[in-house]
Design a protein with these regions (language model features):
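N-terminal active-site segment of His-dependent metallophosphoesterases
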Residues: 1-44, 54, 60-61, 69, ...
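Conserved beta-strand segments of alpha/beta enzyme cores
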Residues: 2, 45-47, 71, 118, ...
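Active-site neighborhood of phospho(di)ester-bond hydrolases with catalytic His/Asp-centered motifs
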Residues: 5-7, 27-33, 47-52, 73-76, ...
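Short active-site segment of divalent metal-dependent hydrolases/proteases
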Residues: 11, 36, 79, 108, ...
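Binuclear metal-dependent phosphoesterase catalytic core
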Residues: 15-18, 67-68, 96, 120-170
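Generic beta-strand structural signal
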Residues: 30, 66-67, 113, 141
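Conserved beta-sheet core of the metallophosphoesterase superfamily
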Residues: 45-47, 82-143
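Helix-adjacent hinge/juxtasegments
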Residues: 49-51, 58-99
Length: 170
């Protein structure tokens, strides 16, 4: 299973299309701040969540999905105040038995872990702060492990990665 996660494209589909033209994905999740017509995302197979600009009532604020026995959370993060701390997101994740939480909003790619829950920000696919190039995340899952790579959306070079064994060790 291969999953794409991107965030904060802010009106640009160029980088997303570049990734989609070079990889095949079983699922695609967008973490908000799309600023494009929702039908343009639907025709690309994107499952989206609300961002903070612009507000779109057609999207959920938080999307919780169980995929191959792993509980994922997909959220923009602004309602969890992720710009300041991961505490609210961590408490929400614990309450909902989340294994891996993906969030956006900050435009900064990062991987964190707290008490066995992984917090992944894929960065911004079109307006990055850190690193200085557009990024997205690719999840590759099999029966024993979950490999998550944050990649440059243009060159596909790996910026950060983590391998999580399904028995809970990384």
């Amino acid at each position: 299973m291969r999953i794409l996660v991107f965030s904060d494209n802010h009106g640009s589909l160029k980088e997303l299309d570049h990734v989609l033209n070079n990889f095949k994905f079983d699922r695609i999740f967008g973490l908000g701040d799309f600023e494009v017509n929702k039908y343009e995302l639907e025709e690309r197979g994107v499952f989206g969540v609300q961002g903070n600009s612009p507000f779109d009532p057609d999207y959920l604020i938080d999307r919780i999905c169980e995929i191959d026995g792993v509980n994922f959370l997909f959220t923009h993060g602004h309602t969890h105040q992720v710009r300041y701390s991961l505490l609210s997101l961590s408490l929400f994740s614990k309450k909902n038995n989340i294994d891996i939480a993906f969030y956006g909003h900050t435009h900064m790619a990062r991987i964190d872990e707290d008490n066995g829950i992984y917090f992944i920000n894929p960065g911004s696919i079109s307006r990055p702060y850190y690193p200085s190039y557009p990024t997205c995340a690719i999840i590759e899952m099999d029966n024993s492990k979950i490999l998550i790579k944050i990649i440059d959306a243009i060159t596909f070079d790996v910026f950060k990665e983590i391998c999580i064994l399904k028995n809970g060790r990384s």
